[in-house]
């Protein structure tokens, strides 16, 4: 789905088609490219799970996170969301950034004047800091869980960038003028119909 640099939320209107395709085929994927911003992903994975499907979504954006052991940004905060359907109950829904903290939370901490945990990010000189301003203003976030989080962030780059035909996070930096406009990113949304892949008792 081509977003033409619009907000990703608009193009999530394709979700009903994704649900239909997954129920017909067992598995379906929706790829959104050239989106300005995806917003939170849990509402869409929850909506898919409410239709009786397992859902996974991930998105990449502009570089803000250094790989484990590095000091320069390469990955986006690269959030992931997962939802599991439950018959006669609300879905189990999970949503998180693969960074140690979402950049929005760092910005809130900066605005409110409180510190962030050690390990959240580095200064522009690559030094550990608990000052959110030093992270937000030229510094860099770190992945959660060190090399493990770094590996998951790389997975998101491959699924929401290379696989769908969009840019890697680091490639968007050249288009970023920091005014809230470009760059753009991609999103990968997977839907699985468990009734086709398992017996009917998968929800025991």
What is the meaning of each model-derived region?
Residues 111-170, 175:
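Secondary-shell segments that build the walls of catalytic and ion/ligand-binding clefts
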Residues 33, 56-59, 83-85, 94-97, ...:
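Short beta-strand segments
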Residues 1-7, 11:
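Single conserved hydrophobic/aromatic residue that forms the stacking wall/gate
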Residues 163, 169-204:
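Catalytic-core signal marking the mid-to-C-terminal active-site face
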Residues 24-28, 50-54, 76-79, 87-91, ...:
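Short coil/turn connectors at secondary-structure junctions
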Residues 65-133:
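Phosphate/diphosphate-binding glycine-rich loops and adjacent basic-rich segments that engage nucleotide
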Residues 16, 20-60:
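A glycine-rich phosphate/pyrophosphate-binding beta-strand-loop-alpha-helix module
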């Amino acid at each position: 789905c081509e977003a033409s640099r619009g907000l990703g939320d608009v193009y999530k209107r394709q979700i009903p088609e994704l649900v239909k395709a997954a129920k017909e085929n067992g598995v379906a994927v929706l790829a959104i490219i050239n989106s300005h911003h995806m917003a939170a992903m849990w509402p869409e994975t929850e909506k898919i799970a409410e239709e009786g499907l397992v859902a996974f979504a991930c998105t990449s954006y502009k570089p803000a996170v250094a790989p484990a052991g590095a000091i320069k940004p390469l990955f986006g905060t690269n959030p992931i969301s997962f939802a599991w359907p439950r018959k006669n109950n609300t879905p189990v829904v999970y949503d998180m950034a693969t960074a140690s903290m979402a950049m929005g939370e760092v910005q809130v901490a900066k605005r409110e004047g409180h510190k962030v945990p050690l390990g959240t990010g580095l200064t522009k000189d690559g030094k550990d800091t608990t000052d959110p301003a030093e992270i937000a203003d030229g510094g860099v976030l770190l992945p959660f869980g060190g090399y493990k989080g770094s590996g998951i962030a790389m997975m998101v780059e491959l699924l929401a960038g290379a696989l769908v035909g969009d840019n890697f996070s680091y490639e968007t930096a050249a288009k970023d003028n920091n005014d809230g406009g470009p760059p753009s990113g991609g999103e990968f949304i997977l839907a699985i119909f468990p009734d086709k892949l398992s017996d009917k008792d998968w929800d025991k």
